[in-house]
Amino acid sequence: MTASKRVAKELEDLQKELPKYLRNLCSEEDNVLVWHALLLPERPPYNLKAFRLCISFPREYPFQPPTVKFTTRIYHPNVDRDGRVCLPIISKKNWKASTRTCQVLEALNMLVNQPEPGQPVRLELAEQLTQDPELFDQMAQEFTLQFGVDRPS
């Protein structure tokens, strides 16, 4: 099965039973290997708004992992300033061809709801989260309200 066929099938399956934390899941009109979605985290401070995502699949998928990038800015120790996510399930070291995109999205949702300061890409935010969680929550809330996308009803 080619990457395009597998990705199209996974997209179709996900759209049939879209998890409650996702909205507006679609591929680019002329490229099924690039998806866009809206992530709706459940926990504060991220549950105040939604966040746009872009998921890009390489032509070698499923033998190479997809990349996940936030296109909405987010104050999070596991997301760099460019929106790239440190998500172990899609690291080259941990990737398995049997992993499905729904599992990647579930892991991403869990990571957003529960930041992992032990695997940061933004060390200063991980330190803030562990040393002053109240300040981290306040900053993350302000950032979320400023840059987040209104949640669909």
From Swiss-Prot:
Residues forming the catalytic site: C86
GO biological process: ISG15-protein conjugation; protein polyubiquitination; ubiquitin-dependent protein catabolic process
Signal peptide (from-to): none
PROSITE patterns: UBC_1, UBC_2
Entry-linked CDD domains: UBCc_UBE2L3
Domain UBC core intervals: 2-149
Keyword annotations: ATP-binding, Nucleotide-binding, Transferase, Ubl conjugation, Ubl conjugation pathway
Post-translational modification: ISGylated.
SMART domains for this protein: UBCc
Catalysed reactions listed for this entry: S-ubiquitinyl-[E1 ubiquitin-activating enzyme]-L-cysteine + [E2 ubiquitin-conjugating enzyme]-L-cysteine = [E1 ubiquitin-activating enzyme]-L-cysteine + S-ubiquitinyl-[E2 ubiquitin-conjugating enzyme]-L-cysteine
Keyword Membrane assigned: no
Pathway the protein contributes to: Protein modification; protein ubiquitination
Gene3D superfamilies (alphabetical): Ubiquitin Conjugating Enzyme (3.10.110.10)
E.C. numbers: 2.3.2.23
Primary role: Catalyzes the covalent attachment of ubiquitin to other proteins. Functions in the E6/E6-AP-induced ubiquitination of p53/TP53. Promotes ubiquitination and subsequent proteasomal degradation of FLT3.
Subunit-structure text: Interacts with RNF19A, RNF19B and RNF144B. Interacts with FLT3 (tyrosine phosphorylated).
Family: Belongs to the ubiquitin-conjugating enzyme family.
Name of the featured protein: Ubiquitin/ISG15-conjugating enzyme E2 L6
Organism encoding this protein: Bos taurus
